[in-house]
Amino acid sequence: MTPLLAFALTYAQFALALAACLAALRILLGPRAQDRVLALEALYVATMLLFIVTGMRMGTPFLFEAALVIAVAGFVSTVSAAKFLLRGEVIE
């Protein structure tokens, strides 16, 4: 791994960790439920990308599979939360 790539991956890890912390703060302090749902989606994306960057840094494919599971769980939870906010129930 070149020093430039190592620096870029380290910087990306810190930036994504900061984004995840700020999204978690937005979940706790969001004034409306819609803000909390968007912050949850941002948290899922930041966590997924953090797993991918860490997998690139470690050179292991196992974290990519974990990132895929996080992406699917994030999609399902976002769709169900949006449906609940829109109609007031998830299952009709």
From Swiss-Prot:
Origin organism lineage: Bacteria, Pseudomonadati, Pseudomonadota, Alphaproteobacteria, Rhodobacterales
Transmembrane annotation, as ranges: 4-24, 37-57, 62-82
Function comment: Part of a K(+) efflux system involved in pH adaptation.
Designated name of the protein: Probable K(+)/H(+) antiporter subunit F
Keywords for the protein's UniProt record, in alphabetical order: Antiport, Cell membrane, Hydrogen ion transport, Ion transport, Membrane, Potassium, Potassium transport, Transmembrane, Transmembrane helix, Transport
Isomerase among keywords: no
One of the record's GO molecular function terms: sodium:proton antiporter activity
Membrane topology per record: Multi-pass membrane protein
Keyword check for Phosphoprotein: no
UniProt-listed GO biological process terms: potassium ion transport
Pfam (any one): MrpF_PhaF
Entry GO terms, CC: plasma membrane
Originating gene: phaF
Family, similarity comment: Belongs to the CPA3 antiporters (TC 2.A.63) subunit F family.
Subcellular compartments: Cell membrane
UniProt xrefs under NCBIfam families: PRK06161.1
